[in-house]
Amino acid sequence: MLKPISITAISSISALGHAPATVWETYLEKTRLFSKMEGDWVSKISAESEQAIAQLIQEKTAYKNLDRTVLLAILNARACVTSLKFQQKRIGVNVGSSRGATGLIEGYHKQFLEREKVSPFASPTTTMGNISSWVAQDAGLDGVTIDHSVTCSTAMHSLLNGIAWLQADMADAFLVGGSEA
């Protein structure tokens, strides 16, 4: 018989906000959260969330080299991990991104075109495995870390993969999600 699986924490960062109460209050306002940016309609994340990202970057020198997708994933993971007390030993992490470290890739490409050199951080900070490994490291978890990319459904695949690992008894808990920047 399959054992029951429960979602015990949830977090998001969007134009609605970051803190659960703020997200709900903004949602109930029924206002549009789109604005024009460089001629395109966008839905930017909240100023509160931008400030949280800036504070995160200040915490560790290594964080300044990370892609925005990784920083967003770390912030969301922290919100989930701090609301729980993980007693289990085998905790996996599966956070994916359909676009990955696009911001850094574009920056490194521009740098190469201008200087004909690329930063030594280009490869390690744009590798797909970067998201889950940084989330696990930040949370102090040492279980399996998995990344993948599935257009438009990466977070759902992370959830399903986490369930599969739990049902197979290869992990006691799983931190799952998707990150796009």
Task: State where each predicted segment sits.
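Short conserved active-site loop signatures built around small residues
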Residues: 155
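Short helices/loops that flank or line small-molecule/ion binding pockets
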Residues: 161-165, 169
